[in-house]
């Protein structure tokens, strides 16, 4: 397995698909990286030469924010929004959907498990 940006990418898949295993790289960015490195997208990772792998590593490390750096940046952005107490920050604090989704009947994933509300107990006559 080739190792790029501290991620083992699968050998038996096409290069453009393998690059999407790296956090922060989607199919569009993967195709863009292949074009910059002048490597065919359809080439399998196991047939890449060492020079091609080095070229890929250099492009990804120098021009893109991926893996730990990107995760850290996202976390810091969320923390900043919480600190300034803007609307999105408040939604994060309350663990509710941030981007305007409905919460009346949906958003179970974000809100957590449903909690039953105790109603009046029926009396037997």
Swiss-Prot record:
<protein>
    <recommendedName>
        <fullName>Small ribosomal subunit protein uS13</fullName>
    </recommendedName>
</protein>
<dbReference type="InterPro" id="IPR027437">
    <property type="entry name" value="Rbsml_uS13_C"/>
</dbReference>
<keyword id="KW-0820">tRNA-binding</keyword>
<keyword id="KW-0699">rRNA-binding</keyword>
<dbReference type="GO" id="GO:0003735">
    <property type="term" value="F:structural constituent of ribosome"/>
</dbReference>
<dbReference type="GO" id="GO:0006412">
    <property type="term" value="P:translation"/>
</dbReference>
<dbReference type="InterPro" id="IPR001892">
    <property type="entry name" value="Ribosomal_uS13"/>
</dbReference>
<keyword id="KW-0689">Ribosomal protein</keyword>
<comment type="subunit">
    <text>Part of the 30S ribosomal subunit. Forms a loose heterodimer with protein S19. Forms two bridges to the 50S subunit in the 70S ribosome.</text>
</comment>
<dbReference type="GO" id="GO:0019843">
    <property type="term" value="F:rRNA binding"/>
</dbReference>
<keyword id="KW-0687">Ribonucleoprotein</keyword>
<comment type="similarity">
    <text>Belongs to the universal ribosomal protein uS13 family.</text>
</comment>
<dbReference type="Pfam" id="PF00416">
    <property type="entry name" value="Ribosomal_S13"/>
</dbReference>
<dbReference type="InterPro" id="IPR019980">
    <property type="entry name" value="Ribosomal_uS13_bac-type"/>
</dbReference>
<dbReference type="GO" id="GO:0005829">
    <property type="term" value="C:cytosol"/>
</dbReference>
<dbReference type="InterPro" id="IPR018269">
    <property type="entry name" value="Ribosomal_uS13_CS"/>
</dbReference>
<keyword id="KW-0694">RNA-binding</keyword>
<dbReference type="GO" id="GO:0015935">
    <property type="term" value="C:small ribosomal subunit"/>
</dbReference>
<dbReference type="InterPro" id="IPR010979">
    <property type="entry name" value="Ribosomal_uS13-like_H2TH"/>
</dbReference>
<comment type="function">
    <text>Located at the top of the head of the 30S subunit, it contacts several helices of the 16S rRNA. In the 70S ribosome it contacts the 23S rRNA (bridge B1a) and protein L5 of the 50S subunit (bridge B1b), connecting the 2 subunits; these bridges are implicated in subunit movement. Contacts the tRNAs in the A and P-sites.</text>
</comment>
<dbReference type="GO" id="GO:0000049">
    <property type="term" value="F:tRNA binding"/>
</dbReference>
């Amino acid at each position: 397995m080739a190792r790029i940006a501290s991620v083992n990418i699968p050998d038996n898949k096409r290069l453009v698909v393998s690059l999407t295993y790296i956090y922060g790289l989607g199919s569009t960015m993967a195709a863009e990286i292949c074009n910059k490195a002048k490597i065919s997208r359809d080439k399998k990772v196991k047939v890449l030469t060492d020079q091609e792998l080095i070229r890929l590593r250099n492009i990804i490390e120098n021009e893109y924010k991926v893996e730990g750096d990107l995760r850290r940046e996202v976390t810091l952005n969320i923390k900043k929004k919480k600190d300034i107490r803007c609307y999105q920050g408040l939604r994060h604090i309350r663990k509710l959907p941030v981007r305007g989704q409905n919460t009346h009947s949906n958003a179970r994933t974000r809100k957590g498990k449903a909690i039953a509300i105790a109603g009046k107990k029926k009396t037997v006559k």
